[in-house]
């Protein structure tokens, strides 16, 4: 096994341990806690693949980090921090909108990579807006925390969330999932808009009609796959 692969796993295990200790003191925000959950799944999978015990790897990772910190000057640390863009958390939804319970009369569930799409196909002829809470880096969507679809009356009728068993996703995964959700809701003659904030950070632009600039391939997929499965 490549020594770099082993040492990388050891360092990741120790850094996860530090972040978990921080979170246990109730000081982590939503994106921070979400990354801990996703990374835990990833580390367990890597442990099985590499055949390395996580506890032993964590101890070895601690020694590696301690050695690096002993050699690190304050000036080098400042330069490294300055060169890394900080993620920020963007909220379309209120805490109440994000946490409220909702149910589906005619449930429909689909998957787009590591994302789960749920929608109520009993909803007809409604004006619907998609809102999301997510983290941003380099002015682009980095990690989707939760996306929900709301009618103009405020009812929750759809959702996109991460699958705990498949941690990690890309902005393309998010855009594909949004396309599937829009296609499913529009099949029942609903009018769907995407919030300007989500458009701006996921697609880099926003349209007044609330329709993101989907690629032709995505448009065909939205129209075709949903029709055949509903």
Curated annotation (Swiss-Prot):
It comes from the Viruses. GO terms for molecular function: protein serine/threonine kinase inhibitor activity; RNA binding. Keywords: Eukaryotic host gene expression shutoff by virus, Host cytoplasm, Host gene expression shutoff by virus, Host mRNA suppression by virus, Host nucleus, Host-virus interaction, Inhibition of host innate immune response by virus, Inhibition of host interferon signaling pathway by virus, Inhibition of host PKR by virus, Inhibition of host pre-mRNA processing by virus, Inhibition of host RIG-I by virus, Inhibition of host RLR pathway by virus, Interferon antiviral system evasion, RNA-binding, Ubl conjugation, Viral immunoevasion. One of its GO terms (cellular component) is host cell cytoplasm. Residues 180-215 are annotated as: CPSF4-binding. It is found in: Host nucleus; Host cytoplasm. Gene3D superfamilies: Influenza virus non-structural protein, effector domain, S15/NS1, RNA-binding. GO terms for biological process: symbiont-mediated suppression of host cytoplasmic pattern recognition receptor signaling pathway via inhibition of RIG-I activity; symbiont-mediated suppression of host gene expression; symbiont-mediated suppression of host mRNA processing; symbiont-mediated suppression of host PKR/eIFalpha signaling; symbiont-mediated suppression of host type I interferon-mediated signaling pathway. A motif (Nuclear localization signal) lies at residues 34-38. A motif (Nuclear export signal) lies at residues 137-146. Residues 1-73 are annotated as: RNA-binding and homodimerization. Upon interferon induction, ISGylated via host HERC5; this results in the impairment of NS1 interaction with RNA targets due to its inability to form homodimers and to interact with host EIF2AK2/PKR. Residues 223-230 are annotated as: PABPN1-binding. Inhibits post-transcriptional processing of cellular pre-mRNA, by binding and inhibiting two cellular proteins that are required for the 3'-end processing of cellular pre-mRNAs: the 30 kDa cleavage and polyadenylation specificity factor/CPSF4 and the poly(A)-binding protein 2/PABPN1. In turn, unprocessed 3' end pre-mRNAs accumulate in the host nucleus and are no longer exported to the cytoplasm. Cellular protein synthesis is thereby shut off very early after virus infection. This is Non-structural protein 1. It comes from Influenza A virus (strain A/Gull/Minnesota/945/1980 H13N6).
